[in-house]
Amino acid sequence: QLVFQVSTKRSVDVVGVASNPWGDVRRIDTPSPVYDHAEPVEIGHVVFFTDRLDAMEVFYASLGFITSDRYPGRGVFMRCAPDAGHHDIFLLALPNKGPGLNHVAFTVRDIHEVFGGGLHMSRQGWKTQLGPGRHPISSAYFWYFENPCGGLIEYNADEDHLTPAWQERCFEPGPTMFAEWAIDGGID
């Protein structure tokens, strides 16, 4: 029997690593980390295929999810709270594709851990589907792997953080909207 239970997210004691964007140097006399594997902090988001996009959006909105962005008639990015990461769930309607799991994303600390985790997965024999790369809609860095359960898994980091002031955006689907840049089949 499947049972759902309301719970709250537990705090995780993870120290992020400062970066040095142009004009805002924060990491001084300290090199960026090199990770030999990833240690995910949380499940960042889940993506489901649906053939009932409008009904699914209404369902998740009734649970309190807020729409962040959308591909009209094709996909909806939704978050659990007004002040949160870009999306916790993405509902994706593709022609001739019924309901199912597309992927589960695991959040890691930074882009360096995306690379370290991705290279580790490759060394363990897991096949890269796409990555590393960057999603322009959420600004997140990613690396996707095939999953023996079906669907994909993703390491991701550096997702946009939204507030109640965020205005939903609409995008036309296309390869550059999915990935600003990406390596097909990985760098392994």
Regions found by a protein language model. Give the residues of each.
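Flexible internal linker/loop segments at domain or repeat junctions
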Residues: 84-101
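Core segments of cupin and vicinal oxygen chelate
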Residues: 48-86
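Catalytic cores of nucleotide-enabled group-transfer and carboxylate-activating enzymes in metabolic
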Residues: 27, 56, 86-87, 108, ...
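Vicinal oxygen chelate
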Residues: 1-39, 42-50, 76-77, 96-188
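Non-heme Fe(II) oxygenase catalytic core, chiefly the N-lobe of the double-stranded beta-helix
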Residues: 27-31, 35-58, 65
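Histidine-centered active-site/metal-ligand motif
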Residues: 45, 85-87, 103, 134-136
